[in-house]
Amino acid sequence: MAESRDAHELLLIEEADAWFEYLEATRGQGEVRYGEVEPWAWSRLRQRLRALKARRARLERQAA
């Protein structure tokens, strides 16, 4: 049970890291540069969140 809780906490930390990566990439960019960087940053964020969702689902199946 404790292992499951630790794994869940690690997934939450990874999710927060994904959001911080997005913010770091887009924050403080000029309008033109933001337009270039934001689609990449959003795509990267969505990719990381999808992977985390899949890992979370696997973790929940194992716990059941």
Model features per residue range: what roles?
Residues M1-A16:
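Short, charge/polar-rich alpha-helical segments
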Residues E24-Q62:
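Short, charge-rich amphipathic interface segments used for partner binding and complex assembly
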Residues A16, E21-L23:
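Face-specific signal for non-transmembrane alpha helices
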Residues M1-E3, E60-A64:
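Short intrinsically disordered terminal tails
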